[in-house]
């Protein structure tokens, strides 16, 4: 893997000709659910290299709960807590437009035929000299692979974008999505980026890692202003983060780190990330010592408690009958 000095040197080479000209910089960083991403190390290095800049740190939370002072200190020890801004997916967003229904229908092969609203945190439209989006490319149940434009449109997105793209991913079947670079949701993100944020000065710092406990190995770091870095990172993540089994598993035990997983909403990744390996009729045992609620926020928690987890077809019928699910 890459050692810390190699990572620092790569970042310095990528931006050393630019950062003397920067005065306002926005770091877009992951929350505690990505503690093995090496994002904390990278963000702290950037913060130290930019003493002449005003640096704001936007937490790409999506619908997740904001990071506590303690979590920020653990993950980003060199960055003062007052520099962090917790993204609020309900209040902090501006609507830019929508990805047309025709495009959505085409990429989903007709599974979804409605437009996707495009809403992002208003800070992404502020007068920053550079936005540095930092995170890990890893298999994801909605987008196929996490990060790149997803970090802006979901991590820093609004309810309309998050809800529509998650529904699109569900309608397209997780088995066709998980671990793939080219998916219907990814194509929607790419189109939204092309249509609505073509001139935003964003650069991507994308890691591919594996971990045993808290021992993180960085297999690759991809720095780019376009999509090529993501494409290469996704290929490496498929190699490092997807495990193929010789035969289906009849029993599996998953332990959810209590520092990362405090809700069933997040803990369901234990299901998403094992289901293609499980035998029909197999047993999945989930040890979740930190899970204390269903949803990441109060409204989502209420809806899950009211309607439960019922499978795709049943949920679609519920959506037809109940306004609060639309």
Question: Predicted regions span which residues?
Answer:
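Short, glycine-rich nucleotide/cofactor-binding loops
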Residues: 30-37, 257-267
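Conserved, well-structured core segments that form the ligand-binding/active-site neighborhood
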Residues: 86, 90-245, 276
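Glycine-rich phosphate/diphosphate-binding loops that line cofactor/substrate pockets in enzymes
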Residues: 10-26, 50-51, 124-127, 197, ...
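C-terminal non-catalytic interaction/assembly regions of soluble proteins
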Residues: 268-326
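Short glycine-rich or small-residue beta-strand-to-loop segments that form or flank ligand, phosphate
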Residues: 24-35, 58-62, 133, 253-255
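Long, charge-dense
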Residues: 56-105, 308-326
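N-terminal amphipathic/basic leader segments beginning at the initiator methionine
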Residues: 1-8
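Histidine-anchored nucleotide/phosphate-binding helix
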Residues: 34-55, 267-278
């Amino acid at each position: 893997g890459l050692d810390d000095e190699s990572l620092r040197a790569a970042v310095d080479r990528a931006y050393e000709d630019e950062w003397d000209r920067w005065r306002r910089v926005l770091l877009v960083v992951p929350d505690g659910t990505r503690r093995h991403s090496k994002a904390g190390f990278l963000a702290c290095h950037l913060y130290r290299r930019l003493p002449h800049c005003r640096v704001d740190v936007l937490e790409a939370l999506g619908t997740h709960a904001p990071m506590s002072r303690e979590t920020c200190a653990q993950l980003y020890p060199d960055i003062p807590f007052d520099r962090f801004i917790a993204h609020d997916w309900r209040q902090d967003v501006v609507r830019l437009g929508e990805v047309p229904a025709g495009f959505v229908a085409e990429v989903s092969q007709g599974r979804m035929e409605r437009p996707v609203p495009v809403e992002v945190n208003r800070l992404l439209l502020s007068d920053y000299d550079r936005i540095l989006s930092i995170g890990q490319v890893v298999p994801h149940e909605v987008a196929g692979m996490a990060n790149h434009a997803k970090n802006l449109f979901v991590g820093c997105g609004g309810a309309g974008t998050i809800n529509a793209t998650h529904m699109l991913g569900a309608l397209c079947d997780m088995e066709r999505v998980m671990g793939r670079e080219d998916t219907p949701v990814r194509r929607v993100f790419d189109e939204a980026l092309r249509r609505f944020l073509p001139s935003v000065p964003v650069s991507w710092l994308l890691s591919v890692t594996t971990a045993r406990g808290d021992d993180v190995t960085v297999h690759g770091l991809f720095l780019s202003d376009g999509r090529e870095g993501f494409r290469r990172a996704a290929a490496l993540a498929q190699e490092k983060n997807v495990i193929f089994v010789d035969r289906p598993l009849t029993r599996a035990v998953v332990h959810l780190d209590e520092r990362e997983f405090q809700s069933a909403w997040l803990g369901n990744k234990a299901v998403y990330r094992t289901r293609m390996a499980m035998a029909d009729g197999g047993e999945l045992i989930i040890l979740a010592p930190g899970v204390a609620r269903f949803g990441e926020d109060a409204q989502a928690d209420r809806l899950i408690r009211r309607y439960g987890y019922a499978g795709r077809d049943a949920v679609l019928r519920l959506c037809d009958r109940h306004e609060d699910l639309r």
